[in-house]
Amino acid sequence: MVEWITSDAPVPYPLAVAEMEARANAIAKGEAGEAVWLLEHPPLYTAGTSARESDLRDPDRFPVFETRRGGQYTYHGPGQRVAYVMLDLNTRGKDVRAFVQRLEAWVIAALDDFNVTGAVREGRVGVWVDRPEKAPLPDGTPREDKIAAIGVRLRKWVSFHGLSINVEPDLSHFDGIVPCGIEGHGVTSLVDLGLPVTMADLDVALKRQFFEVFGA
């Protein structure tokens, strides 16, 4: 059975990484069960294994942490729900691509509870929403904003790190980076989309939809 852990106060990033790694190691050894940890961080940027230095536009704005998860630069901060997912893929299937797709499907299903249509895009990991009310890009491409980021790491086929969904963060904090290395498109949140969703509301949706996507 998956243990659900929720932290009410913002968790410092180094502490979260240490806790995740310890839990993942314990799962791999058969000494602990799987877990999903719901939390928020103080304002910070993280750099994944594919991060480009040029995508860090304002290195002095918030602390920057190098991390060994997949992906590029992302922002974490208050008003953003982070879900660290520590699952044993030895029993759930040793397929990294399928695992990431299930994380995306989980986010999309949770957003659907609030009548938000999330979508994935080829070559752009994460979940996006159409913004037809915004002017298209100069080449005519319709505007889309990112509402959720995904970046995971596996050790002995146990996952850690996970995903983040924007509920009501300060979206200007994303200006210090090129989020996930993708130029042109922006970021949004549930509240930015005009929905009075709370963190507790999202947590209920995440828990319900997790079992639909991943099972027990």
From Swiss-Prot:
Keywords: Acyltransferase, Cytoplasm, Transferase
EC number: 2.3.1.181
Biological pathway: Protein modification; protein lipoylation via endogenous pathway; protein N(6)-(lipoyl)lysine from octanoyl-[acyl-carrier-protein]: step 1/2
Pfam families associated with the record: LplA-B_cat (PF21948)
Active site (UniProt): C180 (acyl-thioester intermediate)
GO biological process: protein modification process
Sequence ranges assigned to domain BPL/LPL catalytic in this UniProt record: 30-216
Binding residue positions for substrate: R69, G70, G71, Q72, Y73, T74, Y75, H76, A149, I150, G151, G162, L163, S164
Gene Ontology MF terms: lipoyl(octanoyl) transferase activity
Main location: cytoplasm
Catalyzed reactions: octanoyl-[ACP] + L-lysyl-[protein] = N(6)-octanoyl-L-lysyl-[protein] + holo-[ACP] + H(+)
Places the protein is found: Cytoplasm
Note: In the reaction, the free carboxyl group of octanoic acid is attached via an amide linkage to the epsilon-amino group of a specific lysine residue of lipoyl domains of lipoate-dependent enzymes.
HAMAP family: LipB
Summary of the function given for this chain in its UniProt record: Catalyzes the transfer of endogenously produced octanoic acid from octanoyl-acyl-carrier-protein onto the lipoyl domains of lipoate-dependent enzymes. Lipoyl-ACP can also act as a substrate although octanoyl-ACP is likely to be the physiological substrate.
Protein name from the UniProt record: Octanoyltransferase
Organism encoding this protein: Jannaschia sp. (strain CCS1)
Gene this chain is encoded by: lipB
